[in-house]
Amino acid sequence: MKRTWQPNRRKRAKTHGFRARMKTPGGRKVLKRRRQKGRWRLTPKVNA
């Protein structure tokens, strides 16, 4: 069986990136919560 984690930087950015979060109301809520919590990173690091 194929493993679930098949690294792909583009997919990671498109799914979890900052611009992807900003696109939807829910994504903006995620960023708001993470800012409130004081997270260093709002979105996963993507070195493309």
UniProtKB/Swiss-Prot annotation:
Output one GO MF annotation: structural constituent of ribosome
Miscellaneous notes for this chain? The open reading frame (ORF) for this protein is entirely within the ORF for the RNase P protein (RnaP). The two start codons are separated by four nucleotides.
Task: State the residue spans of region: Disordered.
Answer: 1-48
Q: Which UniProt keywords apply?
A: Ribonucleoprotein, Ribosomal protein
Where in the sequence is the signal peptide annotated?
A: none
Query: Which GO cellular component terms are attached?
Result: ribonucleoprotein complex; ribosome
- The name on file for this protein is Large ribosomal subunit protein bL34
Instruction: Describe, as the record does, how this protein assembles with itself and its partners.
Output: Part of the 50S ribosomal subunit.
Instruction: State the organism of origin.
Output: Thermus brockianus
Q: List the disulfide bonds.
A: none
Family assignment?
Belongs to the bacterial ribosomal protein bL34 family.
Give one GO biological process term.
Answer: translation
